[in-house]
């Protein structure tokens, strides 16, 4: 057990330590959502921790006491990929990634308080996850998902025959999606049953593919779909799943449906909200999500957008009666927030939903029959909600969340009452020592069209009488936000503790401040958002005396990377000592190489060939803009980023080099739009922070700050001089 002490949070901090470093950030324990047992006594959650010395990330599962917040170890077996409660909560079902079937997984059942007392119920012949269970007579029906072959079988990569050629042949889109070339396999929801034999359950290995009979359907939908894309009714008889509209071009439209199908697959799944269908509200043809059955299984709630090619449209709650032809009802449809998840109370009368509101992921409640103009009520909690589960049959929920100052917040929330803290990681993990809400504050500034929100993040040991260089961080999306939440990639506190004050703006295009602000970036990427950023920068310069804008830096990823490239060619670009652009577009016309065409065709008001002027308007490579470039810039782009090609980053670096501007190109051949592998993440931080520290002067003022020379990777430089030295 000694080797797994990290599984249980430390009771006290070490007596001394450095500020929050990239090593602390990457190696801090990472905890998953806490799922309570049916009695409301314990919750189980996954935890892992990266070890830089051993270059591995062992993991395990813990139990959280819901009365006092105490944590105990359930298992240290890293092969246990997921756990769910069985029956009254005295037992658990878990999936083990090692199995006698090569490439398959085992389904095991164990006592919740004696994990070693486990038995194997059966094997699944392929990768399988996302278990959901429901009692059905003397059986336990379940659903989960895996990859399907074209014939409908569960795909087993280990058993697959090696192709005679590496060729890929396409007659339609997608060719690539996010980080993967699309193949013949696709995601599908499968159903099965655990049969009781005496006091044990067994699984015969038989699964029914519920998705494959619907041609061109796929669920969960990649790249981010998971178990939230489907649900199993409480009686175990009916399954709901979300799929993009099978009859429509998936790369061009976001339309998706909620399908209903018997658990045994005896009928082909049918959509309840088909576009222009008899039950579907008029004009509603956008993306659907989060299907969930009412406790009695007679109704199903889900979320849906209206617009068919807009991934950031406002979601509205919908409720449909199961087995009925009655029209689908829209709930609180005038609420100017976009719900992200929905659940029913145990009596089926109240809906609990999460939604982003003013840069915080909040929990709300509303009646299940709420009228259009109803405004949901906020449930008090700290930080942002990642997930929530009801505690027994009560109105209280167990919230798993995080914030800008802690990567795990477990708390109990009850409508109309103060929240009750169970476990906050920053109060226990040595790596997070000193982090807290005291160093975070909001900033509101008059922007181009309305007031714009930003977060100010201060370093450990902040002194208002001192001056700190500005780190101006621009979020991606563009329909996204800097929220009061923890990022495992771009974490403002890591930047601040190099010796900066971070300002993280939420300009035009950001989510959580009303749909108009989100929509207003359409065909205006370099317009209002840029003006917002200028006004925020000017406000900081003129009114916040502890921030040094003369030695500030700007950095961003994705849309934030585009904005940094845009800023390089604008007056604001001359105000920074250094720039960092991660996976940002450079040449306007290159956007046609992206994967999800609906994204660019919405944001630029037309197709690449019919509205070319809109794509060209915000082209960072225009000669008149490039002529203004002079600020040192770090460019980052990865080979498996299929949102926008690595050629974008290479082209940007080429121009910087030919212009003789101090610049560096950082590339990870095994990373995507994001950098997620621990050792790569450390190098990323060493390069990014080392770059800005060099040009901002932090290396001189803070001897402990990261330097470019701290990175062990050899720099490739085959040229002794710049092109313009000759």
From Swiss-Prot:
Instruction: Quote the EC number.
Output: 3.4.14.-
Note down the stretches annotated as region Disordered.
269-291
GO terms in the biological process aspect are: proteolysis
Q: Name one GO molecular function term.
A: serine-type endopeptidase activity
* Residues carrying a glycan: 96, 252, 605, 638, 699
Q: Which GO terms describe its cellular component?
A: extracellular region
Question: Which residues, if any, are the signal sequence?
Answer: 1-19
**Quick one: where is this thing mainly located?**
secreted
The membrane spanning regions, by residue number, are none
Q: Which residues are responsible for catalysis?
A: 558, 641, 673
SUPFAM superfamilies in alphabetical order: alpha/beta-Hydrolases, Tricorn protease domain 2
Tell me which PANTHER family the record gives.
DIPEPTIDYL-PEPTIDASE 5-RELATED (PTHR42776:SF11), SERINE PEPTIDASE S9 FAMILY MEMBER (PTHR42776)
Annotated protein name in UniProt: Dipeptidyl-peptidase 5
**Species of origin:** Trichophyton schoenleinii
């Amino acid at each position: 057990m000694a080797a797994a002490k990290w599984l249980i949070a430390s009771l006290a901090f070490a007596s001394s330590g450095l500020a929050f470093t990239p090593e602390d950030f990457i190696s801090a324990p990472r905890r998953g959502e806490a799922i309570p047992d049916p009695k409301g006594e314990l919750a189980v959650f996954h935890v892992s921790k990266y070890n830089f010395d051993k270059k591995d990330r062992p993991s395990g599962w813990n139990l959280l006491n819901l009365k006092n917040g105490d944590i105990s170890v359930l298992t240290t077996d890293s092969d246990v990929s997921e756990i769910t409660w069985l029956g009254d909560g005295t037992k658990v079902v878990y999936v083990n990634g090692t199995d006698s079937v090569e490439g398959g997984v085992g389904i095991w059942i164990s006592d919740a308080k004696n994990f070693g007392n486990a038995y194997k119920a059966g094997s699944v012949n392929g990768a399988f996850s996302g278990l959901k269970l429901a009692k059905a007579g003397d059986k336990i029906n379940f659903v989960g998902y895996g990859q399907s072959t074209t014939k409908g079988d569960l795909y087993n990569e280990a058993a697959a025959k090696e192709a005679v050629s590496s060729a890929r042949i396409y007659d339609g889109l997608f060719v690539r999606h996010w980080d993967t070339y699309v193949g013949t396999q696709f995601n599908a929801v499968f159903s099965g049953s655990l049969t009781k034999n005496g006091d044990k359950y067994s699984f015969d290995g038989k699964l029914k593919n519920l998705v494959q009979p619907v041609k061109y359907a796929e669920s969960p939908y990649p790249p981010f779909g998971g178990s939230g894309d489907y649900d199993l009714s409480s009686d175990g008889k009916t399954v709901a799943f979300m799929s993009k509209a099978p009859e429509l071009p998936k790369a061009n439209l976001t339309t998706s449906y909620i399908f209903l199908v018997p658990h045994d697959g005896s009928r082909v799944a049918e959509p309840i909200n088909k576009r222009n269908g008899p039950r579907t509200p008029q004009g509603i043809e956008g993306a659907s999500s989060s299907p969930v059955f009412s406790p009695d299984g007679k109704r199903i709630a889900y979320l849906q957008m209206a617009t068919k090619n807009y991934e950031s449209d406002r979601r509205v709650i919908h409720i449909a009666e199961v087995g009925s032809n009655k029209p689908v009802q829209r709930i609180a449809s005038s609420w100017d927030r976009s719900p992200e998840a929905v659940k029913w109370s145990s009596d089926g009368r109240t809906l609990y939903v999460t939604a982003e509101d003013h840069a915080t992921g909040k929990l709300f409640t509303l009646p299940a029959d709420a009228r259009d103009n109803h405004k949901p009520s906020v449930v008090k909690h700290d930080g942002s909600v990642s997930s929530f589960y009801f505690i027994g049959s009560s109105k209280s929920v167990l919230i798993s969340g995080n914030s800008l100052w802690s990567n795990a917040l477990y708390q109990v929330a009850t409508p109309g009452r103060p929240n009750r803290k169970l476990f906050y990681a920053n109060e226990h993990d040595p790596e997070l020592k000193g982090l807290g809400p005291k160093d975070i504050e909001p900033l509101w500034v008059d922007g181009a069209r309305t007031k714009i929100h930003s977060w100010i993040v201060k370093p450990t040991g902040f002194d208002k009488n001192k001056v700190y260089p500005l780190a101006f961080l621009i979020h991606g999306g563009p329909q996204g936000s800097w929220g009061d939440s923890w990022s495992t990639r771009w974490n403002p506190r890591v930047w601040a503790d190099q010796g900066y004050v971070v300002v993280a703006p939420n300009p035009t295009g950001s989510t959580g401040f009303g749909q108009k602000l989100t929509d207003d970036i359409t065909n205006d990427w370099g317009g209002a958002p840029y003006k917002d950023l200028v006004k925020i920068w000017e406000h900081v310069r003129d009114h916040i005396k502890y921030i040094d804008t003369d030695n500030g830096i700007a950095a961003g990823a994705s849309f934030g990377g585009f904005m940094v490239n845009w800023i390089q060619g604008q007056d604001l670009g001359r105000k920074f000592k250094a720039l960092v652009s991660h996976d940002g577009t450079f040449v306007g016309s290159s956007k046609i190489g992206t994967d999800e065409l609906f994204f660019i065709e919405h944001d630029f008001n037309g197709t690449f060939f019919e509205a070319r002027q809109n794509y060209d308007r915000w082209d960072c490579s225009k000669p008149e803009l490039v002529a203004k470039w002079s600020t040192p810039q770090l460019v980052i782009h990865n080979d498996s980023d299929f949102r926008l090609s690595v050629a974008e980053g290479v082209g940007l670096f080429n121009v910087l080099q030919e212009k003789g501007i101090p610049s560096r190109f950082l590339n990870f051949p095994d990373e995507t739009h994001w950098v997620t592998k621990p050792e790569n993440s450390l190098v990323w931080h060493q390069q990014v922070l080392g770059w800005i520290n060099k040009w901002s002067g932090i290396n001189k003022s803070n001897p402990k700050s990261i330097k470019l020379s701290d990175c062990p990777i050899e720099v490739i430089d085959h040229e002794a001089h710049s092109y313009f030295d000759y």
